[in-house]
Amino acid sequence: MFKKYFLWLAASLLVAAPAHAKLRVVTTLQDFSSIADAIGGDRVETFAIAKGYQDPHFVDAKPSFILKLSKADLLIVAGLELEIGYLPPLIDQSRNDKIHPSSPGYLDASIGCDILQRPTTQVTRAMGDVHPYGNPHFWTDPNNGKVIARAIAAKLSELDPSGKSTYDKNLAAFEGKLDEKDKEWLAKMAPFANAKIVTFHDSWPNFAKHFKLNVAGHIEPKPGIPPTPSHTLEIINLIQSEKIPAMLVEPYFDLKTPNYIATKTSAKVVVFYPSVGGTPEIKDYFSLFDRNIDAFVNAMKGSK
């Protein structure tokens, strides 16, 4: 009888034993949390500070972010000073030594990526909001997405060695799907190779390089500087003279100036989402490109 009781007790304890504790991953962008979810699976729990419909340069720091950071095992950032305006004080106030920049629980996703527009001269405020270490919108190139995924897999394996086989398997699946999707995206964009475009902000050099587009100008006169009447006239003249068919505008910018330019030219306004979560349909890193490329292709076909 006692033997049966102890067997029952042992079985009960095994059933009641807590499952593997999930790694708490906080990211500054939903793009990184999407990739971390794909790699980590049910071994991670993710939270993104900036939502996909928000300007990642300007994030309102909330007390809830400090709480999330205080419990985080891993913090994934874009780096290149994209988060310089809000993140350092949040990290300090979290009092979590695991996620400081010199700690194992901190991952700069830009490392190893193809970073464009690294300044070759001293950066001054007269140049606008120029990032001194290069353009931080690097995740808009699928090749960089693969680099980011590999870095996340390596970091998760470092923090959770028992999950390495899971992370490696999920990484292989992610890379395989990304390769297949990229073939599809490149095929859709191929008819528009070398097309000239105008963008509101300088967010798309990596996207343009990968998909062979030429960014001819920006609606902002300088990065972070609102459109002016004189510069708007210059853009109108540029679009007319170069027969530029499309303007890419992020969802958090005022459409007043782009729409005005559209009335004076044949260029179409195309709302382009720089991050996962920009709309409900953009649920992950793959659907981010699906949505933007379909919107671009439809606009270009309509401009003919």
Segments and roles (model prediction):
Residues 1-3:
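N-terminal secretory signal peptides that target proteins for export/translocation
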Residues 5-16:
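Bacterial N-terminal signal peptides
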Residues 21-304:
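Extracytoplasmic metal-acquisition and chelation regions
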